[in-house]
Regions:
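Structured alpha-helical
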Residues: 1-98
Length: 98
C-alpha cells in the first residue's frame, strides 16, 4: 500500500516541530501548530506540501528539522514524522518536499 492510497491531494495537515512536541509532553507547554495541505506526490516517495501561512504571511519551515505531521484524511487521522528537503516556489505557491 502506498501513502497516496491513504492520504490524498488536498488533505489538510497540522505541522509541529517534533522536538517541541516531545518537550511539551514533559512540561505541559502548548506547541505552535501550523496549518497546511498536501499538494502532490512524487514518484520517489516524497510529498509536496504547501508552506503554511500565518496572519497572511508565509512561514518558512527550516530545512533538516524534524516535524510532526498530522494528516486529516476522509477516513481517519494519520501521524508521521518528516523533514523539509527542499523549499521552492511553483505557480506562486511555496512548496516543500517531505
Amino acid at each position: 500500500m502506498k501513502v497516496s492510497d491513504i492520504i490524498r491531494i488536498g488533505d489538510k495537515i497540522d505541522i509541529r516541530v517534533l522536538q517541541e512536541v516531545e518537550q511539551a509532553e514533559k512540561t505541559d507547554v502548548t506547541v505552535k501548530t501550523y496549518k497546511s495541505k498536501v499538494l502532490d506526490f512524487r514518484s520517489n516517495g516524497n510529498m509536496e506540501i504547501a508552506m503554511p501561512m500565518e496572519a497572511g504571511k508565509l512561514v518558512l519551515l527550516q530545512l533538516g528539522v524534524r516535524y510532526e505531521l498530522v494528516f486529516f484524511s476522509r477516513e481517519s487521522l494519520y501521524r508521521a514524522v518528516g523533514q523539509v528537503k527542499e523549499r521552492y516556489k511553483k505557480d506562486n505557491i511555496c512548496l516543500r518536499w517531505n
